[in-house]
C-alpha cells in the first residue's frame, strides 16, 4: 500500500479517514462534531424537521456513547477543518476532544449542492456517472447529497 495513506490531505489519507467514520451517526447539519446534548438542542432548533421527537432517543444514545457525527458534506468539511481528521478517530467513545477550525485549509462552509457549484467555479473536472474516474476519494454528488 502507498505511503500516501499516512500523509494528511492525500486522497488515500482522506479515504482511510472516511472508512474509519463508516457506521458513525449521520446528524443533519453537522461537521465532524462530538455528539452532545447542546449540539442536539441547537440543531433541533435550527432544523426541526430533521430532529423530531421520534429521533431523540437515537441522538441521546449517540451522546451517551460519546460518538462523533457528521452529515454528508460535513464529513468532507470536517476532515479539512480538523487538520486532516487529527484526533477525531481517537476521540470516539471517549471524553477526548479534538480541534476544529471553521473554514480550515480553505474549505468553505457550503451545502452539498453549494460545494459542487464551488468546485466547478474553481475549475474542478466534473461529469456524468459514466465519466467518473476510478480514483479513491473522489466525490460523487447528486442533488442535495454527496458521497466519497
Model-identified regions with their sequence ranges:
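N-terminal capping segments
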Residues: 1-92, 142-145
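Short alpha-helix capping/helix-loop boundary micro-motifs
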Residues: 120-130
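Short, glycine/acidic-rich beta->alpha junctions
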Residues: 131, 141
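Short linear sequence elements within intrinsically disordered, low-complexity coil regions
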Residues: 31-33, 103, 121-123
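Short, basic/aromatic beta-hairpin or loop at an interaction surface
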Residues: 85-120
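Loop/turn positions that initiate beta-strands
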Residues: 134-137
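Helix N-cap and loop-to-helix transition residues
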Residues: 10, 71, 111, 128-129
Amino acid at each position: 500500500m502507498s505511503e500516501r495513506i499516512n500523509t494528511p490531505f492525500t486522497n488515500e489519507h482522506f479515504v482511510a479517514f472516511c472508512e474509519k467514520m463508516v457506521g458513525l451517526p449521520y446528524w443533519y447539519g453537522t461537521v465532524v462534531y462530538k455528539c452532545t446534548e447542546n449540539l442536539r438542542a441547537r440543531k433541533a432548533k435550527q432544523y426541526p424537521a430533521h430532529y423530531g421527537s421520534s429521533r431523540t432517543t437515537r441522538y441521546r444514545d449517540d451522546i451517551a456513547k460519546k460518538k462523533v457525527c457528521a452529515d454528508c458534506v460535513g464529513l468532507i468539511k470536517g476532515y479539512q477543518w480538523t487538520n486532516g481528521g487529527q484526533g477525531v478517530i481517537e476521540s470516539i467513545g471517549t471524553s477526548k476532544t479534538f480541534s476544529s477550525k471553521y473554514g480550515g485549509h480553505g474549505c468553505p462552509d457550503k451545502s452539498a449542492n453549494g460545494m459542487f457549484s464551488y468546485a466547478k467555479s474553481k475549475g474542478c473536472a466534473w461529469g456524468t456517472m459514466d465519466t467518473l474516474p476510478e480514483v479513491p476519494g473522489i466525490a460523487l454528488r447528486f442533488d442535495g447529497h454527496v458521497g466519497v
